[in-house]
Amino acid sequence: MIIMRKIYFTLIALLASINMFAQGWPANYSGVMLQGFSWDSYDYSQWTVLEKQADDMKGFIDLVWLPQSGKCIETTQVMGYKPYYYFNQNSSFGTEAELRSLIAKFKANGIGAIADVVVNHRNTDGWFTFPAETYNGVTYKMLPTDICKNDDGGATAKQATKDGVSLSNNNDEGQDWDGCRDLDHKSANVQKIIKAYLKFLKEDIGYTGFRYDMVKGFSGSHVADYNDATGVKFSVGEYWDGNPSIINWINKTNKKSAAFDFQFRYNVRDAVNGAADGKVASFSDWSKLNSTNNLMHDANYRQYAVTFVENHDMQYRSASEPLDPLRKDTLAANAYMLAMPGTPCIFQPHWRAYKQELKSMIEARKLAGITNMSNYTNKMAQTSCFANETTGNKAKLIVVVGNNTKAYTPSADYAQILEGYHYRYYLSKSAETAWCNIPSGEYEAGFKAKLTAVSQNSNAKLVYTTDGTAPTAKSKQVTTGSTINIDNTCTLKVGLLINGNVTGIRTYNYTIKAFEPYTI
């Protein structure tokens, strides 16, 4: 009987362990992701440059999606979307040693690195030659028979006939891409090599999760298989299509991967532009945010929604390659995204341009306890003003965006904590917390910080210190809405003072580094 009970509990533990890795993206996840690169961002996205930013990201950014880190066959700088080597991790963004150092620094700061996994296709030397790579005593080499029979619209088959080479007997399972050889994911050799590659990325290099590129090119069932083989906790696929197709792909992975919420992005673009399909009207139409055409709105799929408002395939590149960027209201777009369920992914150029504002939005999101599965209610949907209330597991957060944010005023149960160009945040007073509108970080000069008492007690005051000690009833005292001067590097601690008791303390670490002129 004792033996049977041990077997039973062992099986239960095993099933629980398997199930833990079967969701593709954690339930009730409160993290925020940063896309750590943009197109041709070879300077800003060097591993050494990103490593220096890890301390500043701590507490705000939980995951950083890195550019494809494997070595390519080209000798010039490339973004990595035509992969050649899998086990050689020296790229246009730095050496393998620098990559390992970056990922270790991220982990020390509570940040996970997401690998850009490009396995729909692979580059070759000539038409058919893949590299032979040896890792842990095993040599891995793909063959011409690992290339889809109808690759490159049949051009590869014609060349194979000319060269006397045999391709796979299987056609491509999805969309063809003529930039490289499309891999046959039904091939046992392809599956073996990709699984070894992904285990190498996770277990050796130290990546926390995977972003799968161009998953329209092969069946989602293979993503499920690869994730099962590696036991990865975070997986997101780039299925660039309409909402029904994205949901269908998630289902094909057996919900073992999240997906980028492209329709959420298009909702935001159309609201900002005031028109659909990338056109720009005279005025924005914020009511377009009131859409059910996205993953984020669906309670059955918002866990798997990675929301974004712009990425490297949409950003403005040049006059000859303008693509489909946000034309305006970048801050308001991000304010909306960061107040909503799903896992928000901030674009690196936005982070660089508006880091202070985005940090405050993230702080508000986390203070309210908003997760990828939180529920929300629309409060107003007008052309010039849109408001949603999201219920976190700690408090409620109302986001108001539009050309006339004053058109919506919440009840007295809310306190305004943030205001910027075409956006406002209101936090429910049930949060019972102090708030400062300037987030932790490094600044080039002193500044004024506004303190707010978010409390149901109308008599609540604020007490604060700037020496890192916990504030008491005898500390400096101000009323809600007051501003204080921060002129030097310090640790601000501010709390609510109610009936002689101090609660809801928030901590802000400020480094003031005056700009030092230099000769060019």
What role is predicted for each listed range?
Residues 1-7:
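Positively charged n-region of N-terminal signal peptides that target proteins for export
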Residues 10, 20-21:
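Cleavable N-terminal signal peptides
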Residues 29-31, 72-104, 134-184:
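Aromatic- and acidic-residue-enriched carbohydrate-binding clefts of CAZyme catalytic domains
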Residues 185-197:
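Alpha-helical scaffold elements lining the catalytic groove of polysaccharide deacetylases
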Residues 429-520:
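Short, compositionally stereotyped local motifs that mark structural "simplifiers"
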